[in-house]
């Protein structure tokens, strides 16, 4: 695939990451403005690099023609919480939102990976407005706590 086509494919994902970061940062701001504790400590995001997408497609035998239908983490958001119990509060916030629809949840807190990895992954459908109209894309939201509070 040539670079111009990749740019066209990835642009909606870049927009989604930017929009969702603004929304989560606004949630933090709302809590703090009300002098309330925010379950969200910080948030960041990224769009997977072309080389990472190609490698994932190769490993999982995904044809490039259907990459946007099969690769659910091209757009990724990481929500950092201070405490483990905040993770579930953030997941509830995501579930109540009308601007994204949960399509899959993976609770690696209750179901710890063999590597010891703990996080809560939520795959959502998210609509972005482009020059070509509305595009619904997958965004993976990882909610985690880097604290040592795992028991």
Model-derived features with residue positions:
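Generic alpha-helical secondary structure
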Residues: 9, 13, 17, 50, ...
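An acidic, glycine-/histidine-flanked metal-binding catalytic module
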Residues: 1-31, 140-151
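Conserved phosphate/pyrophosphate-binding and hydrolysis machinery centered on Walker-type P-loop NTPases
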Residues: 10, 43, 80
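Long beta-strand-rich cores associated with HINT superfamily self-processing modules
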Residues: 68, 81-151
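Surface-exposed, low-hydrophobicity interaction/linker segments
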Residues: 20-21, 25-60
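Short amphipathic alpha-helical segments
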Residues: 73-77
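Short, flexible, solvent-exposed loop/turn segments with mixed acidic/basic and small polar residues
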Residues: 32, 61-71, 111
């Amino acid at each position: 695939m040539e670079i111009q086509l990749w740019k066209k494919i990835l642009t909606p994902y870049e927009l989604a990451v930017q929009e969702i970061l603004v929304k989560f940062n606004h949630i933090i701001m709302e809590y703090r403005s009300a002098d309330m504790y925010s379950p969200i400590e910080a948030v960041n995001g990224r769009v997977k690099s072309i080389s990472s997408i190609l490698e994932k497609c190769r490993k999982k035998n995904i044809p490039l023609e259907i990459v946007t239908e099969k690769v659910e983490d091209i757009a990724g958001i990481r929500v950092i919480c201070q405490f483990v119990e905040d993770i579930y509060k953030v997941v509830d916030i995501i579930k109540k939102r009308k601007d994204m629809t949960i399509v899959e949840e993976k609770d690696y807190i209750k179901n710890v990976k063999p590597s010891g990895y703990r996080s809560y992954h939520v795959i959502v459908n998210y609509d972005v407005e482009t020059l070509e109209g509305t595009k619904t894309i997958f965004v993976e939201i990882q909610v985690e706590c880097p604290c040592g509070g795992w028991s």
